[in-house]
Amino acid sequence: MARVKPLGKKLRMAKAIKQNRRVPPWVVAKTGGRVIDNPKRRHWRRSKLKP
C-alpha cells in the first residue's frame, strides 16, 4: 500500500482500527453476559475494507 495516503482513506482506516476492538469487560458485566461479542469485528486477512 502507498506510504502517502489520501486524507479520507487515512481517516477511514483510523476509524476501522478503533472499531476493531473487543467488547470491554465492564460492558459484559453490566449487561449480565447478554453482550459478549462485537459483530463488527474484522480480521485483516478475511475481509477487507471498502476502498
From Swiss-Prot:
Family: Belongs to the eukaryotic ribosomal protein eL39 family.
A Pfam family hit: Ribosomal_L39
Gene Ontology MF terms in the entry: structural constituent of ribosome
Protein's GO biological process: translation
Family matches, as SUPFAM superfamilies: Ribosomal protein L39e (SSF48662)
Membrane-crossing segments per the record: none
Protein's UniProt name: Large ribosomal subunit protein eL39
Domain of life assignment: Archaea
InterPro entries: Ribosomal_eL39, Ribosomal_eL39_CS, Ribosomal_eL39_dom_sf
Species of the source: Methanopyrus kandleri (strain AV19 / DSM 6324 / JCM 9639 / NBRC 100938)
Record's keyword annotation contains Cytoplasm: no
Entry's Gene Ontology cellular component terms: ribonucleoprotein complex; ribosome
UniProt keyword annotations, A-Z: Ribonucleoprotein, Ribosomal protein
